[in-house]
Amino acid sequence: MAVLIGLLFWFCAAARHGLLQSNAYDLGLFDQWAWLIGQGQPPISSMEQVHVLADHGAWMLYAAGAAYSVMPSVQWLLSSQAFTLSFTALPIWWLAQQAGLTPRRCWLMCGLWWLQPVVFNTNLFDFHPETWVMPLFALALWAERAERPRVWLLLLLLLLGSRDGLVLIVGGMAIDLAWRRRWRWSATAAGLSITWLLMLSRWLYPLLRNGEGPKAAGRMFSHLSGGPLQAIQSLDWGGGLLYIVLLCLPCIGLWRKRSLPTLMIGAPLLLVNLLSASPSYRTLIHHYSLPLAVVMVVAVIDARPQQIRAIRGFSWTLGWAVVCWLALAKPWYFSGPYLSRVSALNDAQEAISQVQDTDAVLTTSYLVPQISQRSRVAFPKKGSLRNLDNSGWNVLLLNPNDPGWGSTKRLQKNLLSEVQQRGWLCENWPSKLELCRKK
């Protein structure tokens, strides 16, 4: 079943990418980094001018670089993400077995995972390396309960190697362990998360960012820099409450008092999402809440003592999960929003065929992932690019009628007018896509 669902996830993600709905952030970004690693070049993004390790400390991306050295393809990222999300059900099954649930109830726990809206939506939303370690996160919970300290510690190290933000999950595990009076385990998890955070913020990030610390922290929490009253007023109370309700909706009816320690694992990450200045942290569309889905399903497992023979309302439980998935997941995007560029597919393919591997290309955000396996590629961000003086770009592939995320019609029109005045060779298509090459 996990294989079939993994194939379905991969098909959906690949279809979205093929329909020109993926973006520079983040599929194009990670695709370029993986390609640069595979080519033996410095993995510094031409879009962000940032080393791969200075982004989120995700050293596990070097594994993708090894795959790219054999055969460079964005499908490495999409397929690995799809299958790791699907196969997270395996350690969830083991956790359910460990708790004494019957095989039928173990299947129900797997179904609850597969039907988490944030799981499906994360699979669709480009690529993010923390998806690789969701099986390891669930397995780490199993290893702790099975008294496997070495396995547990190794899994935590791998967890941290996919994204710096997962220090919040490891810190949450320390809280859970302290609640259960497992003091040595708690101290180990807390020490590991604090050490990793300090190593990144005080050494690695400044080393690779010319003395600067983590880029996301300033953006996420700058609104909290005033007094307490100002900070309270700046919080998104309504959006935060709705986010919590929608996030918990598939599982909340299955939690019991016994679930509370497990739910504490997600508390630090949930708090950061609520405090963030960006509303995207408080949606089920993005990947920021993905680890919380693991926590919520494991909390359902922990709600049931081993002596319980059956979970009441098996069909109702599964049916409710399906209803929540249909309401909050985004499969229906394939019947509408994801079809918005179908008429431009042939034009885009023809234009891309004229782009050479060595070209430095400035294009729309949704075309970046189609051509990101090169040393220089980016999209014209609004407010950051006024002209092409000393920019080094030799190809523009833009569509002012559909400028894509982060750009504007006016900016792209101005850039095209500028290169036409400079005598670049330009070709356009019926969809208003225009390719200009420097002579």
Give residue spans per PLM region:
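Hydrophobic/aromatic-rich transmembrane helices and adjacent perimembrane loops
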Residues: 263-308
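Short acidic/glycine- and proline-prone juxtamembrane loop motifs at membrane-interface regions
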Residues: 122-130
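Extracytosolic helix-loop segments that constitute the early lumenal/periplasmic catalytic or substrate-binding loops
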Residues: 11, 29-52, 59-60, 144
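Short helix- or helix-capping micro-motifs
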Residues: 106-117, 156, 160
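Membrane-interface transmembrane helices that cradle and orient dolichyl/undecaprenyl
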Residues: 98-100, 129-132, 137-151, 178
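Membrane-lumen/periplasm interface segments of specific transmembrane helices
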Residues: 12, 22, 26, 183-268, ...
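Transmembrane-helix motifs of polytopic, lipid-linked glycan transferases
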Residues: 75-100, 120, 139
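Signature aromatic-anchored transmembrane alpha helix within multi-pass, membrane-resident enzymes
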Residues: 2-3, 104, 190-194, 305-330
